[in-house]
């Protein structure tokens, strides 16, 4: 059978690098052929973080960063192809998520904005790019997120098996696969790594808390935990999605101001528990028992996985490796899959998940010619 090669590009709310994956969709399950992470240069990272919050001269900064991020994504593709020793002519299309700089679906006229100019990516790689996946769903009255549940359904669902796929990036999202003819459900539970990363970056200038070791050295403060979990987002009904617009460094500092007597590691432990408790609450609402498979950066945080398991005794906990998909690359593979769906003219959103009025083909194609 002829190979069906697509490339997926993903940079999430953690902004910890651009993940590039080469995936073959010619078989019954996606096959990861090769992967690469392109580091985000510090000057670009600072520019993106600044753009995620309201500020002056935004349009000029947005335009420049749109091109800069496109160039970085193109570099990630070219380095991936060199690593895999695959010719660009063998790739059907690139699926690029871009970099989210605003996600505001609940305004009177909701919107979401990802940058990383697909014209630049197509021109600098010589490969057609499919991008702008979220805005069709928003135009149909949906949240534009999460989009990965449709991929999870096709890849991980099994009749008779009640499964939850938990993706823990900067924001955490769940996909409920009932194992029956019931609707698949999915939504963002709230912060994943974004606040625990922000705190260790602020205090220790380290990019992330490896294995949750710093959190493990602290003791959770129940009063701070209760305050953090009182955020209105956690009591919203789904469909719902969120991002840095709600959960960011400024919000965290505001929450911490009455607790400045706490040790820094105790705050880290409490932030980790906020992530775990908010996830566990939503998982239990979906089903008190079943199988839970974790992907994303959080799958590699030992302390997070241990605390989550303790909060979910009715669940068998594992990573998506057990289902044949490397948890580090799962979201990149999903965006390669979204590109394939667009190329074939097939819908890729789940209205029961996003709240859109109907299924739709997502994304637009940007030719390399």
Swiss-Prot record:
Q: Which InterPro entries match?
A: Anhydro_N_Ac-Mur_kinase, ATPase_NBD
Q: Which reaction does it catalyse?
A: 1,6-anhydro-N-acetyl-beta-muramate + ATP + H2O = N-acetyl-D-muramate 6-phosphate + ADP + H(+)
Does the keyword Electron transport feature in the UniProt annotation?
no
Superkingdom assignment: Bacteria
Q: Does the keyword Nucleotide-binding apply?
A: yes
The biological pathway it contributes to is: Amino-sugar metabolism; 1,6-anhydro-N-acetylmuramate degradation; Cell wall biogenesis; peptidoglycan recycling
Going by the record, the broad EC class of this enzyme is transferase
Pfam families for the chain:
AnmK
Citing just one GO molecular function, the answer is: kinase activity
EC number, as in UniProt: 2.7.1.170
The family database entries (PANTHER family) matched by this protein are listed as: ANHYDRO-N-ACETYLMURAMIC ACID KINASE
What function is annotated for this protein? Catalyzes the specific phosphorylation of 1,6-anhydro-N-acetylmuramic acid (anhMurNAc) with the simultaneous cleavage of the 1,6-anhydro ring, generating MurNAc-6-P. Is required for the utilization of anhMurNAc either imported from the medium or derived from its own cell wall murein, and thus plays a role in cell wall recycling.
Which HAMAP family did the record assign? AnhMurNAc_kinase
So what family is this one in? Belongs to the anhydro-N-acetylmuramic acid kinase family.
Query: What is the name listed in the Swiss-Prot or TrEMBL entry for this protein?
Result: Anhydro-N-acetylmuramic acid kinase
**Which organism was this protein described from?**
Shewanella sp. (strain W3-18-1)
* Gene that encodes it: anmK
């Amino acid at each position: 059978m002829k190979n069906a090669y697509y490339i997926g590009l993903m940079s999430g709310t953690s902004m910890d690098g651009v993940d590039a994956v080469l995936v073959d969709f010619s078989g019954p399950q996606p096959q990861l052929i090769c992967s690469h992470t392109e580091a985000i240069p510090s000057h670009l990272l600072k520019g993106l973080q600044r753009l995620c919050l309201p500020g002056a001269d935004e349009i000029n900064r947005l335009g420049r960063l749109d091109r800069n991020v496109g160039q970085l994504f193109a570099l990630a593709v070219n380095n991936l192809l060199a690593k895999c020793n695959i010719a660009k002519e063998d790739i059907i299309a690139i699926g690029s998520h871009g970099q989210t700089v605003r996600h505001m679906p609940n305004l009177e006229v909701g919107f979401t904005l990802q940058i990383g100019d697909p014209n630049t990516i197509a021109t600098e790689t010589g490969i057609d790019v499919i991008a702008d996946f979220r805005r069709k769903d928003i135009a149909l009255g949906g949240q534009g997120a999460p989009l990965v549940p449709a991929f999870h359904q096709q890849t991980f669902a099994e009749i008779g098996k009640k499964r939850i796929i938990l993706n823990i990036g900067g924001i955490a999202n769940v996909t409920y696969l009932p194992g029956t003819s019931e609707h698949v459900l999915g939504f963002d539970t709230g912060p994943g790594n974004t606040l625990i990363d922000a705190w260790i970056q602020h205090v220790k200038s380290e990019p992330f808390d490896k294995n949750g070791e710093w959190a493990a050295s602290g003791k959770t403060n129940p009063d701070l935990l209760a305050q953090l979990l009182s955020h209105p987002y956690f009591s919203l009904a789904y469909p719902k999605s969120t991002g840095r617009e709600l959960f960011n460094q400024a919000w965290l500092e505001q929450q911490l101001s009455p607790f400045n007597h706490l040790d820094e590691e105790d705050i880290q432990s409490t932030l980790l528990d906020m992530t775990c408790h908010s996830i566990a609450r939503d998982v239990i609402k979906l089903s008190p028992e079943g199988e839970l498979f974790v992907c994303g950066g959080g799958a590699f945080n030992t302390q997070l996985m241990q605390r989550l398991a303790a909060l979910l005794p009715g669940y068998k906990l594992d990573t998506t490796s057990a289902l044949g998909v490397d948890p580090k690359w799962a979201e990149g593979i999903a965006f390669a899959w979204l590109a394939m769906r667009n190329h074939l003219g097939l819908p890729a959103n789940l209205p029961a998940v996003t709240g859109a009025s109907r299924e739709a083909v997502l994304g637009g194609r940007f030719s390399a010619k």
